[in-house]
Amino acid sequence: MNNMNKNDVNKIISVYNYKKRFFLEFDEEQGWIIADNIAESLKQKEHVEVSFNRVPKVSFIFITSMLGKLLICHGFSAKELEEYIFYTGLNVGIEAQIEMAIQQVSSRPIVTMTEFRRKRED
């Protein structure tokens, strides 16, 4: 996904450590918490390694919650995420989810229900 040198990493965030006890799935709340931790480092222009080691699968909701919060709430660009975040322990499924989520969250304008109704009526 990116070619960052591992020596440039300032902080390592293990997704596995955020897993709720006794739950197998990662949810949107955990995605938001991880996003806030990543954002702390990105605001300082620090490189972050997000490790998916020991995580066999995550839901698309988890990935979009994490990346959506970084892009929308914290205001980072997709380019900044690509430049400062280094992912490890990815399998093909998680990597595809990250790519789809970044594309979905960064390229589509957010449509409110009022705007949606207006578009349907036209």
Predicted features, each with a name:
Residues 1-4, 66, 100, 113:
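Detector for methionine-enriched segments
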Residues 1-17:
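Short beta-strand/loop segment at the start of cytosolic alpha/beta domains
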Residues 5-8, 77, 112:
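Serine/threonine-rich low-complexity intrinsically disordered regions
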Residues 7-10, 21, 41, 120-121:
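Conserved catalytic alpha/beta core of Sir2/sirtuin-type deacylases, generalized to analogous enzyme cores
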Residues 17-48, 52-102:
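Amphipathic alpha-helical interaction surfaces in cytosolic regulatory modules
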Residues 106-110, 114:
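Aromatic-anchored, charged helix-turn/loop surface patch used as a conserved interaction hotspot
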Residues 113-122:
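A cross-taxonomic marker for long C-terminal extensions/tails that follow the last structured domain
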